[in-house]
């Protein structure tokens, strides 16, 4: 490939931009192509002259390195590099209709320029450059110039500040107050607290007085140790008084193993009677279903209430003194009134 060094090369990138320059180096291992005296001719109608169309750039770059993945087409031209002109449309629109755009720069062009000669590229005074001889009206875009736009942002943009201030002056009434204050506060330099003062002592530090405080604390520790020793000594003297079994109350109580705690049920019954009364000695039957009996005596309604004992049979023997009649439900008969002035003797209450 050395026979092609110095030949005029026409290279079309994946973004449809055409670059023309002299072949400087080809690295087959890294897959790179290096051109010198490179000019960008733009897309030359490959975008159908629409809004994405990129127009020629008059800037000449000393050296540009292209990666193989960035190259779409490459051809060798026999013509002189100065005789090659970009393809421009016959009817160019006026310069006022083109949007403001940044100059198109080839990939890695700026890096190579800094390494070799660092050429100074003149910046246009207006957003739309004037017509270039042989190139027609040139209006580059900013969609494919990330590197150039970043470098432009690093320089102070006086024109953008003036335009923003004009727009802010027009729309000042509609702009929120907090945004105005935010813009003002962001431009102010940070202020330091000048009223802050540090108290600086005029005298030297007194080490003797501070050491005396520590020695005083040591004396208090000695006194505390003496108090603890005296308290321990008194406790030792009190331990000499042994336990007296004769005068102790708990030694007279017998243990459960010496006497038999199993009492007969008669003794337990008598103990319950003495403690809880006669009601505790009554037998308690809890068998249900064997029988049910009520023996009630009502005299003038209210002398006695319900009182009875549930036994093993069911029988009702009732005596009512209201009407003077004796009724026995088991006999199923009734006697005339006033026949008995007193209840019969055979009635059990």
Swiss-Prot record:
Compositional bias (Basic and acidic residues): 165-178, 215-236
Cited Pfam families: LSM14
Record GO biological process: negative regulation of translational initiation; P-body assembly; stress granule assembly
Extent of Polar residues compositional bias: 144-164, 186-195, 322-349
FFD box (motif): residue ranges: 241-257
Residues annotated as domain Sm: 1-80
Residue positions, PTM N-acetylserine: 2
Keyword check for Transferase: no
Disordered: region residues: 89-128, 144-239, 275-349
Residues with PTM Asymmetric dimethylarginine: 288, 294, 298, 306, 310
Keywords noted in UniProt: Acetylation, Cytoplasm, Methylation, Phosphoprotein, Translation regulation
Residue list for modification Phosphothreonine: 139
Compositional bias segments (type: Low complexity): 89-113, 311-321
Function summary: Involved in regulation of translation and mRNA degradation. Represses translation by binding the eIF4G subunit (TIF4631 or TIF4632) of the eIF4F complex dependent on its RGG domain, forming an mRNP repressed for translation initiation.
This protein's name: Protein SCD6
Species the sequence originates in: Saccharomyces cerevisiae (strain ATCC 204508 / S288c)
């Amino acid at each position: 490939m050395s026979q092609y060094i110095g030949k005029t090369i026409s290279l079309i990138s994946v973004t449809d931009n055409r670059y023309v320059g002299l072949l400087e180096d080809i690295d087959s291992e890294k897959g790179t192509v290096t051109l010198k005296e490179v000019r960008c001719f733009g897309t030359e109608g490959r975008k159908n002259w629409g809004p994405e169309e990129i127009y020629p750039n008059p800037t000449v770059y000393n050296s540009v390195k292209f990666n193989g993945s960035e190259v779409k087409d490459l051809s060798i031209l026999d013509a002189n590099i100065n005789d090659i002109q970009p393809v421009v449309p016959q009817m160019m629109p006026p310069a006022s209709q083109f949007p403001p755009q940044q100059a198109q720069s080839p990939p890695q062009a700026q890096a190579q320029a800094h390494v070799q000669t660092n050429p100074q590229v003149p910046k246009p005074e207006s957003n739309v450059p004037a017509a270039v001889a042989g190139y027609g009206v040139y209006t580059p875009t900013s969609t494919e110039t990330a590197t150039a736009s970043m470098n432009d942002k690093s320089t102070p943009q006086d024109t953008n500040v003036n335009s923003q201030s004009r727009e802010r002056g027009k729309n000042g009434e509609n702009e929120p107050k907090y945004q105005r204050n935010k813009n003002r506060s962001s431009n102010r330099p940070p202020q330091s607290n000048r009223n802050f003062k540090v108290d600086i002592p005029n005298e030297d530090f007194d080490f003797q007085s501070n050491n005396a405080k520590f020695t005083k604390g040591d004396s208090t520790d000695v006194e505390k140790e003496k108090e603890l020793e005296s308290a321990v000594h008194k406790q030792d003297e009190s331990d000499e008084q042994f336990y007296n079994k004769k005068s102790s109350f708990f030694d007279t109580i017998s243990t459960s193993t010496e006497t038999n705690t199993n009492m007969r049920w008669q003794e337990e019954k008598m103990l319950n009677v003495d403690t809880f009364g006669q009601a505790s000695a009554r037998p308690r039957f809890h068998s249900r279903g064997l029988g049910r009996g009520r023996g009630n005596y009502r005299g003038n309604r209210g002398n006695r209430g319900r009182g009875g004992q549930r036994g093993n049979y069911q029988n009702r023997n009732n005596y009512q003194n209201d009407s003077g009649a004796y009724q026995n439900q088991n006999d199923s008969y009734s006697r005339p009134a006033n026949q008995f002035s007193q209840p019969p003797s055979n009635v059990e209450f």
